[in-house]
Structures are given as C-alpha cells and as structure tokens.
C-alpha cells in the first residue's frame, strides 16, 4: 500500500512539474465528469462542531476504485497557527475492498479545486477574459491563479482580503508569475473591470462578499467559498441574472449559493450540472453579454480524480512510502496470529 506524505507529494510534483500536473488533472476531471452516470455518489455527510465542520466524501466508480476524503473547515484555525482546511484520503479496490493508497489531501484539495475551477472557467468564461478579481488571498488563492492562467491569458489580478497579511503573502508568492498584481482596498475595487471574479473566502456565514450592483454583463463568477450549510458569498439577487452551473445539484442545494432557495426555485434557476458542459449536451456560454456563475462546493468526484492521478504517478516514479494497513497473514481466518 502506498502512503503519500506531504514530502512524497512534493517529490512527485517536482518530478512531474506543477503545471503539467494541473493540466493532467484537468484532463482526468474531464474524463471522470464524462462518465458521470457510472459513479455511485452522495452528498457528503457532515458534522457541525464548535468552531467548524467535519465531513466525509465517498464515491465509487463501480468498476475499479472507491475513494473517500476526510476534510474539515475551521475558519478560526489561522489564529492559532493552523490550517483552515486539512484533509486526508484513501483509494481502495472495489473487488476486494483492500486499500491501495492513503494520502495527504490538504494540498491535493487545493490542486483539485484549482483544476476544477479552471475547467469550469474554460467552459463558461469569455475567451477574451484577461482580468481576474480574486476575493480571498488565503491558502487556495495562488493555486487558483495558477489554474486559471492555464485556460485564459490572465494579464492582471486584482485582489482583496480582509487580512492584510494574507495579501502581503499572496503578493510575495505571485511576484514572479509575470502577471500585473493590483492590491485593492475593498472587494468592490477588485471587482471593478474584472472579466472573471473568483471568491475563495472562509467566513462561515451568509455574507455578501460580492454585491449585485458590482456585477457587470459578460462576467464569469467562480463562487468557491460556499462549502457548508449557512456559508455563502454572493448577494442573493445576483443569482437570477446568471447562467448557473453546479457540480452536483443534490449537494449544491445543501451547501452552495443556491441553498437559500427552496427546491423548486433552485431547480428552475440551475441551468446545468458541470458534467453536462463537459459532455457537450449544454453550452456554458452562448454570448459575450451573459453573466455565468459556477456555484462550486467541491465534490467527491474531484477527489477521486486527484487520488487516481497521484496513485499512477507514485507508481510511475516509485515514490511514496510502502506500509501495511491490513494484516499480512497466511490464514485470513486466523486474525489473532498477526499478534502472536
């Protein structure tokens, strides 16, 4: 069984290349969204606890693999020097149930979120989109810029965060990327003139991070911060103006921007699930005046894609630690022999 630690993952990314990994991950996501109906999936179960939420994200392809991810969201963790989001995941065979890989998924979650947003943006944003407004410059912000840079010729990033130190960090990390960086005093200033608006905030509340009056015709919005009940980022009146795409309606209705609508309203408003854009049955955009919205909550299929890709690369480069999470015994009915 492969064990992918942070150190192992860094070696894989250094060996393969960060941008190439994101490109291949986008292709893996396309492949897996393209066979959407073959997966057994469910909205993730969650437990709301003091300070945050704990979630499990299982999925099965009904052919080869089953994966799950454990993930949290504790917005106040940075105050004690800890990550807002941490995650681990497992890839298992479905024919025997045996695990093949156990992996860190804090970094993998950021990578798959970036690749998934880039995929949706490629299908929904105007081709001439060059200016990105980024609201929230926390742990996922740099990954988002790197992903979007693959699918659009981003020339300028206008960014804002309520934490000035987070903006300092973002500017330092992005200084050499070859894109004009514009530090803004508030979200309205950042959004002004943007072609793409990406929100990646952590506040566990219904907050109008983006106001309706700021949103102009032709803009594409990636609303990525909504990932649990009671956590949204857009003024509700924005939604009826948009062509709204979600990943998985059953989960988005619980956790996404559309959670504030009743079921009938949400069904009427949502134009498509992302797989329908991937397979070409629906178009992400039909003209340059449309406002498009990717109401993303993050789903288990994305974790499946990133775990499968990482497993293949770990085998290819013989990286990752080998370990036993199951007993190695000659008689499978003699479990106690492992202890004798």
Task: Give residue spans per PLM region.
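Short helix-loop-beta connector
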Residues: 125-131, 153, 216-217
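NAD(P)-binding Rossmann-fold cofactor-contacting core
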Residues: 151-175
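Short glycine-/small-residue-rich Rossmann-like dinucleotide-binding loops
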Residues: 201-203, 225-226
